[in-house]
A protein has these predicted regions:
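Membrane-helix interface segments in multi-pass membrane proteins
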Residues: 88-109, 157-196, 245-295, 350, ...
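Charged/polar, solvent-exposed surface patches and flexible loops
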Residues: 29, 54, 79, 122, ...
């Protein structure tokens, strides 16, 4: 009976995500993986990937319950061996001058790239469980290939550039003809590069939106809100950060070389060689650093954008408060320490960056967590395994 009182709206509970792993603990997993991969000439790679995924999944706490990585090792090994065979076949064809075979294999690789991506996402999500409920990727192959159209546009751009270059360049060209052809060749390459960058932006947006929109947990679909313009803004801002980093490095190089340049004429023999080697190492070191802040900036901005604009149907959503500046500084510190320790700081770097991203996300659930978990478990039982196995062959782990 309605007594005129408003109905109580279901409450929304917040559950911060948490990563409970540690750098020292993961270092033991990492060093064993590295040693066994070296000893087995790389064939331990699928086992190493599974151990790494199990560690990070198992220490990622969502509402006080860890994720589970349940991928079958056999599938990961078969996929890895198949990729090794394909790579060796391509390398043999390239080194023996089989240009037609190489071209056909490259075209086949471009054609199968969406299939590999779709198989990888299906494999990864199907291997992830939370409270016994499995995630699923339900996109059809036509949907995957339609989302991959930027990949084919980029391939056509480079094919057109190759045709244009072939028409302008020949082995019998005179120096004057080569000079005249340089302009059109640069224009063709520049146009292909520009098209590729735009296509990469669109491809990233298409794949992320398809992954979230076609993901299922217990039958509940994912919810995706970002638009392509959001990705364009992040890419443009990333270019600005990269240019700023280049300018800063250039100023440092001028200052260092200007100070040491006066020493070179007065030094002879071994001392001059050592100074030259030191400058070269510093140059390579700075080149490696120059892209680090830009890549970290883009990664952090995308992390915030995605996790602030996705959810699970209308029953759960996420919020992210990742500090972009803090993440960039963490990446720079990790790069420096990894270089100074000859790579041995790498596992600590991975853990610290993963923890910062995970700990920045909060899950908001409508109606209570136990009610949601029970609903997801019941709906999953009705779906069965048909959707999960629709790919037929999961190649990439």
């Amino acid at each position: 009976m309605d007594n005129g009182m408003p109905r109580a709206r279901p409450g929304i509970d917040a559950y911060p995500l948490e990563f409970s792993g540690g750098g020292g603990e993961f270092f033991r997993v990492w060093i064993v993986n590295v040693l066994l991969t070296v000893v087995t000439f790389g064939f331990y790679t699928p086992f190493a990937r599974r151990r790494t995924a199990q560690y990070f999944w198992g220490h990622t706490m969502v509402a006080d319950s860890p994720l589970e990585f349940t991928a079958q090792q056999k599938k990961m090994v078969v996929g890895f061996l198949l990729l090794v065979v394909l790579y060796l076949a391509f390398k043999v064809a390239a080194e023996t001058g089989q240009d037609t075979t190489v071209s056909l294999m490259m075209l086949a690789g471009a054609g199968f790239a969406p299939y590999f991506w779709g198989s990888a996402m299906r494999f990864r999500l199907n291997a992830t469980r939370w409270r016994g409920v499995r995630l699923q990727f339900t996109a059809t192959w036509p949907e995957v290939y339609f989302a991959s159209w930027p990949l084919f546009i980029a391939a056509l751009a480079w094919a057109g550039a190759a045709v244009a270059i072939d028409a302008r360049v020949s082995p019998s060209m005179t120096p004057a003809q080569a000079k005249a052809a340089a302009g059109p060749v640069l224009i063709a390459v520049g146009f292909a590069l520009l098209v590729t960058v735009v296509c990469l932006m669109r491809l990233e947006f298409n794949y992320k939106s398809l992954l979230v929109g076609k993901a299922r947990i217990g039958g509940q679909p994912g919810r995706w809100k970002p638009v392509f313009g959001d990705f364009v803004k992040i890419w443009l801002a990333t270019v600005g950060v990269f240019v700023g980093s280049v300018v800063l490095v250039a100023v440092l190089l001028v200052a260092v070389t200007g100070g040491l340049g006066s020493l070179l004429p007065r030094k002879a023999g071994l001392a001059a060689i050592l100074i030259g080697i030191a400058l070269f190492i510093a140059f390579v070191f700075l080149l490696f650093l120059v892209s680090g802040p830009a890549r970290a900036y883009r990664e952090a901005r995308l992390h915030r954008l995605v996790w602030n604009n996705i959810g699970v149907s209308h029953v759960a959503r996420f919020k992210c408060d990742l500090r972009v500046g803090g993440y960039v500084m963490l990446r720079v510190k990790n790069i420096l320490l990894t270089l100074l320790t000859l790579g041995f700081y790498r596992p600590f770097a991975l853990v610290s960056e993963y923890r910062m991203k995970v700990d920045s996300v909060t899950l908001h659930v409508k109606g209570g967590l136990d009610q949601l978990a029970g609903q997801l478990a019941r709906e999953e039982q009705g779906l069965g395994d048909a959707i999960a196995d629709a790919a037929g062959l999961d190649l990439v782990g």
